[in-house]
Amino acid sequence: MPKIIENIREKLLDEARRQVMELGYSAMTIRSVARACGVGVGTVYNYFPSKDMLVASFVLADWQECMVRIGQSCRECVEAGSNLKHPVGGSVCGSNEVDTALRSIYDELRRFTEKYRTLFQDESAGATFATSFPQRHKQLRSQLAEPMQVFCQVQSRVSPDFLAEFIAENMLTWTLAGRTYEEIGSILIQLF
């Protein structure tokens, strides 16, 4: 009879994350995660079909939490600026509210990228995920842009969809490069 282990999926994810961060991507294996969790290799494969899916699963869980906080920042921007009126009509965020939202979003991205900097800079992980990078990057940019569209409505010179994607692309690029909000915030706020 198979043994029942409570929260085994979470334990596997936590152990895989720990090993990747402490030992590196190439050192973490399905076997090492199984051994550390006291389960058979087959048990890990019941939850994750590959090492790459195991890694993607713990990164995705943290990304989703990051996106919840980013969405909240964008909603707060709209709520804080709900008494401000755009010259063409309708409620919008003011520049202070937009700056606060952009800073909050950037800070969330910085926390996420700092948490996974070891993984993002790991050469063997980079080689493994190189083929899927363009597709995943586009997906991340779109996910990041979506909540920002609510305050990009104020900008009438360009499409709000494009403006949100433009800001998202810059934030992704510069957080990964280790730049601070102070370095790019004054440029981004000029778009509004």
Question: What positions do the PLM features span?
Answer:
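Short hydrophobic/aromatic patch on the recognition helix
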Residues: 38-48
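Hydrophobic/aromatic-rich alpha-helical bundle segments in the mid-to-C-terminal region
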Residues: 121, 151-192
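Alpha-helical DNA-contacting segments of helix-turn-helix folds
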Residues: 54-62, 120
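Basic, helix-initiating cap at the start of DNA-binding domains
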Residues: 1-23, 27-36, 53
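Secondary-structure edge/capping motif, primarily at the C-terminal ends of alpha-helices
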Residues: 73-84, 116-127, 174-178
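Amphipathic alpha-helical packing segments from all-alpha helical-bundle domains
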Residues: 71, 104-112, 127-165, 186
